[in-house]
């Protein structure tokens, strides 16, 4: 399945549900309390983040999609903090504030990136807390997807009113369910329970076949358009009536914190579907997004550039022949992992042992090696008639197959100054008997603090000599 980045800027999404504030007290612990056998935390930083349905809306906005949010809060400091955070992120938030009830707050006490304690401040909302008062049609105006973010806190009581109103307008409804009664989501386009939530409804699943069978029965019973079961380290399973089950493996490189991963899944699904992606593609994108967010601390969102880089990796463009756009993203990703970038360039018309040795030496100067290749017209201008022997596509394909080479890109000019100005490598490498100040582009690289290195060439290895031997039938 080939993935591409959706046009999220044209994908308005409405989120309705339980909003809350995730508050973090970060501090250090160096002693045990004399009052009880518990650690003493000296609080050094207090951090507020949108949680629950607010985190879903935040994730949608972080991808670049227009996001609106409807929910219930108290009339207090926590509600103001939520409103300010969401406003700053570009989320249009409509809160029904109830004076006599507190905004739901999840307070986590953290030390050295470890959660020591969670304290919940919440009271169940009244049955009529989220009174839409006939505003449903107005709220759905211009929306391409509706998300019901249900945390079972009482704000979301009118599931069917919302589902039926959206269906009447042809708007897909995605629900992140809670509780032991999934009938309240009847008719939804897609629900996204995790495995424990799913098994609480259908019973334990002995294996994948059992999960698929029970999932199909649940879809039929509730008239669901689709069912996505998130399964932690086992990935996700998408079920659709009349289609085979689609199992996706987990994509996380490192799991640091699973807080809010479900929010990231449904937000990426919603934004992708709103942008016109088919459901299997949207699920694959959501799976990539989940793999990113579990590597972050606490409730977090992923950005469009992060998702774009994950798509690149999934499509195998982490190495090989790249466009300039792909290369710049790959470089950003490498630098985020503290990897240094090495750059070299040449015609590489007939690849020989000297080239291979030189490229291995160049790669040893850093973590990632870019090889920039003169295109065919450029080689012809430099080398004369009859050159190149091999087209630029063939030359780049051979270079990309070498273990020392990470990325290959072509350029049309005689020299790579324009490319160097965009790439800004940490090290510029050239082979030959030049002095450093004679290397083309050395001034560009040196100006921003990069290094320039000249490597010796392997003796008796020359493309020109090989071409002459061939022409002379030697």
Swiss-Prot record:
Catalysed reactions, semicolon-separated: D-glycero-beta-D-manno-heptose 7-phosphate + ATP = D-glycero-beta-D-manno-heptose 1,7-bisphosphate + ADP + H(+); D-glycero-beta-D-manno-heptose 1-phosphate + ATP + H(+) = ADP-D-glycero-beta-D-manno-heptose + diphosphate
> Record-annotated residues binding ATP?
194-197
Pfam families per the record?
Answer: CTP_transf_like, PfkB
Q: Name one GO molecular function term.
A: heptose 7-phosphate kinase activity
Q: Where is this region: Cytidylyltransferase?
A: 343-474
What are the GO BP annotations of this UniProt entry?
A: ADP-L-glycero-beta-D-manno-heptose biosynthetic process
Where do the record's region annotations for Ribokinase lie? 1-317
Entry's EC annotation? 2.7.1.167, 2.7.7.70
**Keyword terms, alphabetized:** ATP-binding, Carbohydrate metabolism, Kinase, Multifunctional enzyme, Nucleotide-binding, Nucleotidyltransferase, Transferase
Tell me which GO cellular component terms the UniProt record holds.
cytosol
Q: Which residues form the active site?
A: 263
Pathway, according to UniProt? Answer: Nucleotide-sugar biosynthesis; ADP-L-glycero-beta-D-manno-heptose biosynthesis; ADP-L-glycero-beta-D-manno-heptose from D-glycero-beta-D-manno-heptose 7-phosphate: step 1/4; Nucleotide-sugar biosynthesis; ADP-L-glycero-beta-D-manno-heptose biosynthesis; ADP-L-glycero-beta-D-manno-heptose from D-glycero-beta-D-manno-heptose 7-phosphate: step 3/4
Membership in a protein family: In the N-terminal section; belongs to the carbohydrate kinase PfkB family. In the C-terminal section; belongs to the cytidylyltransferase family.
Assembly and binders:
Homodimer.
| Protein name, as recorded | Bifunctional protein HldE
């Amino acid at each position: 399945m080939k993935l591409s980045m959706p046009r999220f800027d044209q994908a308005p999404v409405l989120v309705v549900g339980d909003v809350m504030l995730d508050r973090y007290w970060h501090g250090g612990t160096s002693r045990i309390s004399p009052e009880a056998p518990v650690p003493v935390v000296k609080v050094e930083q207090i951090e507020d983040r949108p949680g629950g349905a607010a985190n879903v809306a935040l994730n949608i906005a972080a991808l670049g999609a227009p996001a609106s949010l409807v929910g219930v809060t108290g009339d207090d400091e926590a509600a103001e903090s939520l409103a300010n955070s969401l406003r700053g992120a570009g989320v249009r938030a409509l809160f029904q504030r109830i004076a006599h009830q507190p905004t739901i707050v999840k307070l986590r006490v953290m030390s050295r990136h470890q959660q020591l304690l969670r304290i919940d401040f919440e009271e169940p909302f009244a049955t009529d807390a989220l009174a839409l008062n006939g505003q449903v049609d107005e709220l759905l105006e211009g929306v391409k997807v509706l998300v019901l973010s249900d945390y079972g806190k009482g704000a979301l009581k009118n599931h069917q009113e919302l589902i039926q109103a959206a269906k009447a307008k042809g708007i897909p409804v995605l629900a992140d369910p809670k509780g032991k009664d999934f009938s309240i989501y009847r008719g939804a386009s897609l629900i996204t329970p995790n495995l424990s939530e799913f098994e609480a409804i259908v019973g334990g699943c002995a294996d994948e076949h059992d999960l698929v069978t029970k999932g199909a029965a649940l879809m039929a019973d509730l008239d669901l358009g689709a069912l996505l079961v998130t399964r932690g380290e086992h990935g996700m399973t998408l079920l659709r009536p009349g289609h085979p089950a689609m199992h996706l493996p987990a994509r996380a490189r490192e799991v640091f914190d699973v807080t809010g991963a479900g929010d990231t899944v449904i937000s990426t699904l919603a934004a992708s579907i709103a942008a016109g992606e088919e459901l299997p593609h949207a699920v694959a994108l959501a799976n990539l997004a989940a793999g990113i967010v579990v590597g972050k601390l606490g409730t977090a969102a992923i950005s469009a550039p992060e998702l774009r880089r994950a798509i690149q990796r999934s499509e195998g463009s982490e190495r090989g022949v790249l466009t300039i756009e792909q290369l710049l993203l790959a470089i950003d990703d490498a630098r985020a992992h503290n990897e240094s970038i090495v750059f070299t360039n040449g015609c590489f018309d007939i690849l020989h042992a000297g080239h291979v040795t030189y490229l291995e030496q160049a790669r040893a100067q850093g973590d990632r090696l870019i090889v920039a290749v003169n295109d065919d017209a450029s080689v012809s201008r430099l080398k004369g008639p009859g050159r190149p022997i091999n087209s630029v596509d063939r030359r780049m394909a051979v270079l990309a197959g070498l273990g020392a080479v990470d990325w290959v890109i072509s350029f049309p000019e005689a020299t790579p100054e324009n490319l160097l100005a965009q790439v800004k490598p940490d090290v510029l490498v050239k082979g030959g008997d030049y002095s450093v100040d004679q290397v083309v582009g050395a001034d560009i690289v040196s100006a921003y603090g990069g290094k320039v290195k000249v490597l010796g060439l392997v003796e008796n290895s020359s493309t020109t000599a090989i071409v002459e031997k061939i022409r002379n039938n030697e």
